[in-house]
């Protein structure tokens, strides 16, 4: 028997079926960096329009986690697709280098600052520690396939950047937004420093909730207010609080001016005043079941009444406040100006003196109360409850009241509001808050709910506390008068001198400089240096001013896009917006894009205690970076991004489908030279023109979705193209023509031309996401080309179906619907054991005139499109008596299927009646003989 294998054009490629990404990707990376790929892209795109994605600097502290990977890969996808779109899209990665987390890590390594090591040495160790951490993170980011200027990143601890941060601060000062004030700020006892709002997280917390009585001093006035004789009675104004430790700082009691307050007699022995709307709630809480309402008045009438502190020997006034609420408590609030923003505002209104009785480590100072001297505030609650009991002021206590409470995000310990002298940026000076609200409307927020988020935060944001009591940070390099605390009159000029020193020697220069080194000798002894450092959010928030103008590749152009996690509305987006608006009057960005956080399949936050943490390093080690990148691109990152082993398995299946489609294309164009073998569109087989038309449609959709940052839609469309239009139809149908026709026939070269156009397009579609795989595919595509797909632009060789084509798009859709119905019948018949596959079948299509006319266009090639051994079209009326294997899924169509007649051709596997017609080729059909020794068959449609 003759072996006809050598007469077939069987697929061949060196492009492997198995990706083996964990092994192959590092080799690809080596080649990228050996060839200076990033620099090559910059050179190729140097004259193109700039697109600047400004990297929000991640904090330098340990190996990257999955959130880091999501952020960096999304940025890389955008920059690569922008390059394909014709932009020069450089990427300069950055790192946030100063601040408390670094100090804490260094303290763990060398011991406590000020005890085991002096500040100057400590700063030096911090700098070296940061450099080590950067190398760890850089290695991880590079392994992700992220292209960037990794040899020249920007660091907030670069000497020039530190100097420019100081210059940024000087602009804030010169524009009049900077001041020193004593205000309540979040204070962490372990940090011994103020915390930014973004450094505070709210956790479930148990506190003692207490109802406390303040005793009336002026019974006569109260009697007049309620029109009842209470002169000989004990009258109490009752407050409710979850912070008993703040009671020693009490300076007033507030009521709402417009609320109604009732005088209540309890068991005919006690008289209390509380909000009318909360009487029933309070009585139930204090377990009082017998009371009488004696009178009612407005909060306004209670103003300036005096009440005795429950366990300290001084009186406090009643004040009015719109902040008093009726959602809990008693409608009466005790005021401790040191420990609450609302309390502080009231204190300013009534000119109370702010007295701090708690030190930086959270202990009471001396002479507050004999039982509280030196006691830590959270440990004082039980002592204070005991004092209240002794004085008869405690009406009720709940020791396990659960509520949200601010915690230090670094130490995971509760914090307090503490009034301290700090440097602030005013949110309301020169109408800044309203300017910010106007500015945000000029920015595109993606998703658009981000605009509402940041708008709400701006409306409610207090003044920005810029100062920190730390060592490792950019200094606030000011000189203040020793007696008046006023800034030196030449502050701006002095800051420039200091910035020049820092530019040469780093922030250590500030601590090395003496006052007389900067200020003239005759006044040097009148001034002292400020030793506070800047909030690290000022460091990163000023990079649009301190970094962007310094990089030549940015051509002094402002950033187009900021892309970070949704937590950055109150972080980097906010700090950058404030600083930019203060200095330039404009937003620092044109677009802001946010992504959600990673969670497990059940929507739970990843944590070691739950055992659901998946690291990017694990994914890369087991599956490769392209799988991680594909999962990121496939996820709707505007929401929480779920990941699990099952989800990764699905991602791998998607990857295989894309890779196998690419491999099929490559395997069937291995002998194709696009310069010599391409077929002109007018001469191509119509199915091939349809395939190119579909690829063009997909490309337009893909580019549109890339432009909208809808990467999950990009992947879905590519997957649909590979699975449905290609895998389930085109690639299946062309196998007969590709394998059996003459090697150099127009029929085969037309098919190869289409596959070439498709792979040229597809490799670009996937390059921003599957960067390693796209690079591998690129090197296997025939024809002259540049070395890397990443220097290219979208493929322009695709075309639409021509008006000269007999089959238009509508006709093809009609055929595909018919084919789908035929496939259902084929599968049903196969399951019944009558046929083994579609080539075992012969079909008759009974169709109404319009449908029949469309199908008859295809003539005797119809069977090739249906992948059956024969197929004919008959008038619908002829099929009335047909019942076997009939399906009428399409109106006006009946299908009759039977086992094909004739013998099976050993070469093309079609059942034919002409097998054995040629003596020397007794086992193959006449068509195959023609393709082997004759001029070859001719096709027009399939």
Swiss-Prot record:
This is Isoleucine--tRNA ligase. Its EC number is 6.1.1.5. Its main location: cytoplasm. The keyword Nucleotide-binding applies. L-isoleucyl-5'-AMP binds at residue 564. A motif ('HIGH' region) lies at residues 58-68. IleRS has two distinct active sites: one for aminoacylation and one for editing. The misactivated valine is translocated from the active site to the editing site, which sterically excludes the correctly activated isoleucine. The single editing site contains two valyl binding pockets, one specific for each substrate (Val-AMP or Val-tRNA(Ile)). One of its GO terms (molecular function) is zinc ion binding. It holds the Pfam family tRNA-synt_1. InterPro entries: aa-tRNA-synth_I_CS, aa-tRNA-synth_Ia, Anticodon_Ile_BEm, Ile-tRNA-ligase, Ile-tRNA-ligase_type1, Ile-tRNA_ligase, M/V/L/I-tRNA-synth_anticd-bd, Rossmann-like_a/b/a_fold. PANTHER family: ISOLEUCINE--TRNA LIGASE, MITOCHONDRIAL, SOLEUCYL-TRNA SYNTHETASE. Catalyzes the attachment of isoleucine to tRNA(Ile). As IleRS can inadvertently accommodate and process structurally similar amino acids such as valine, to avoid such errors it has two additional distinct tRNA(Ile)-dependent editing activities. One activity is designated as 'pretransfer' editing and involves the hydrolysis of activated Val-AMP. The other activity is designated 'posttransfer' editing and involves deacylation of mischarged Val-tRNA(Ile). It is found in: Cytoplasm. Zn(2+) binds at residues 905, 908, 925, 928.
